[in-house]
């Protein structure tokens, strides 16, 4: 009989994974560790879709971890995430909890499930200078030439693509092929949402967030002294809203380009999860449209080795 050390709930943006994870955590009297590369930032609430109200289930507050741990402008990375995750994970295990890992950042999830040894890669000024004038498409071509990508973070800006190349060059000469942490035996639940429904939910949610004040949220962050280029670095909402605020895009252009970018992001998330399956991760897919109670019942049957 398998003995699971963790439950992982993953899925693309707008699949409803957080609502389900919180309900499952309430059922199991446990806590959630977030696996979202942007929800770690304070003040970046609407644009990252924190939806903290989801962590209140029938009046019960579900404890969550690795949300709101950094200030905007800081460039947090998977190396730091891995260390932060295991600190929280070990504490929860000592307290007798079965942790739930929930998120859509596949790189973070895979790094902790497999215990990869990751290096805190320093900047390479000479390499950065040599890449400075290349287009995003040219940088993506360079990235595609590497046999293994240690950092497949979303390269939707040239700055991120250059950082990814920097990491690959460093790993070519520095990285030992060993694990830093023991791999975790996790039950992995994937929330599957039909492509057209996903697109519909993404588009509807974008307009809701704009109505809720997402533009003002970005203005407020910029007013604290965070540089526009540092927000652009985070991509998606923060990239396009910043470009709108500094006058490089009209409102209509911003909404149109952002909507396309989020759809592309969701597709990349699914590509990563399928890649995880090819790399040996067994993912049990559950239909996003099922009622929460049915999702929980299915998960409990798998957890108890009945499926």
Swiss-Prot record:
One term of GO molecular function: tRNA dimethylallyltransferase activity
Highest taxon of source: Bacteria
InterPro entries: Dimethylallyltransferase, IPT, P-loop_NTPase
Coiled coil: none
Span list, region Interaction with substrate tRNA: 36-39, 159-163
Ligand binding (substrate): 13-18
Enzyme superclass (EC): transferase
GO BP terms, alphabetized: tRNA modification
Cofactor(s) it depends on: Mg(2+)
Pfam family, any one: IPPT
Reaction it catalyzes: adenosine(37) in tRNA + dimethylallyl diphosphate = N(6)-dimethylallyladenosine(37) in tRNA + diphosphate
Function statement: Catalyzes the transfer of a dimethylallyl group onto the adenine at position 37 in tRNAs that read codons beginning with uridine, leading to the formation of N6-(dimethylallyl)adenosine (i(6)A).
Protein name: tRNA dimethylallyltransferase 1
Organism: Parabacteroides distasonis (strain ATCC 8503 / DSM 20701 / CIP 104284 / JCM 5825 / NCTC 11152)
């Amino acid at each position: 009989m398998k003995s699971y050390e963790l439950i992982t709930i993953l899925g693309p943006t707008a699949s409803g994974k957080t609502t389900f994870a919180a309900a499952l955590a309430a059922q199991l009297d446990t806590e959630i560790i977030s696996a979202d590369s942007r929800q770690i930032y304070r003040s970046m609430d609407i644009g990252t879709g924190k939806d903290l109200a989801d962590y209140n289930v029938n009046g019960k507050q579900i404890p969550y971890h690795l949300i709101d741990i950094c200030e905007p402008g800081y460039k947090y990375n998977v190396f730091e995430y891995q260390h932060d995750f295991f600190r929280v994970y070990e504490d929860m295990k000592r307290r007798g909890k079965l942790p739930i890992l929930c998120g859509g950042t596949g790189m973070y999830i895979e790094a902790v499930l497999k215990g990869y040894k990751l290096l805190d890669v320093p900047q390479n000024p000479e390499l950065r200078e040599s890449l400075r004038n290349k287009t995003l498409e040219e940088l993506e071509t360079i990235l595609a030439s590497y046999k293994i990508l240690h950092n497949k973070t979303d390269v939707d800006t040239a700055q991120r693509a250059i950082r990814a190349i920097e990491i690959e060059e460093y790993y070519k000469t520095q990285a030992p092929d060993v694990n830093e942490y023991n791999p975790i035996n996790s039950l992995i639940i994937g929330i599957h949402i039909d492509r057209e429904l996903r697109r519909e939910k993404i588009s509807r949610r974008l307009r809701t967030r704009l109505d809720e004040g997402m533009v003002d949220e970005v203005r407020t962050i910029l007013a604290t002294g965070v540089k526009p280029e540092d927000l652009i670095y985070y991509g998606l909402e923060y990239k396009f809203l910043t470009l709108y605020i500094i006058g490089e895009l009209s409102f209509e252009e911003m909404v149109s380009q952002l909507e396309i970018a989020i759809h592309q992001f969701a597709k990349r998330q699914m590509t990563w999860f399928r890649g995880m399956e090819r790399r040996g991760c067994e993912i049990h897919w559950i239909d996003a449209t099922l009622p929460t109670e049915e999702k929980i019942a299915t998960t409990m049957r798998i957890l108890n080795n009945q499926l």
